[in-house]
Amino acid sequence: MERTRALECFLSERQESEEKAIMKNLRLKEVSIKDLDQIRALYWRLLDSSPKYGQILQWKKNIYPNDDDWNSYIVKGEMYLILKDVDVIGAVAVTNAQSKEYGKIQWKVKADDQDVAVVHLLMVLPEYQGDGAATAALDEIIKLAADKKKKAVRLDAIETNVPAQKLYEKYGFVNCGTAQEYYESTGETEFVFYEYALAE
């Protein structure tokens, strides 16, 4: 029994050590229009890897996300690749203000639209999931927002995306409520809205 406990402790410590190593080597890189093909290929690679991603995320090729979505973020300097050393392992959009649908949520932090950063389309390739990469990406997003003097980081997760909800809550994001939204890819669907307060 003691040997089993010692082994479990060792494996847990080793996993934590490996996750910290990933966090140390992970960074965000802003992209340009010339990177659009690479961005698209990343998201399609995720969706093609398993039907579960389309079901959980409710993403549909060329409906959402599509080139117009990515371009709108890229031209405003809000689209990023997630890099581990030199390897591209994911992507994310971090906007410099919130959109109108966020105005109906009862947020904990009092802030104008331009005083918050909003996370969209966060994705990590399947082979890097489960090893701390998503948490490390959130670390970098929080740093990015803090450097821009934002008061909070906000995001939403579709109700079917339970893994993301667990990730955000474990990280420290506060559940600020739900709202029904209509999108072409999802229809009328409930979303959960989260907020992470930044120290002033």
Question: For each predicted feature, which ranges?
Answer:
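Conserved acetyl-CoA-binding loop-helix of GNAT-fold acetyltransferases
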Residues: 124, 130-143, 166-170
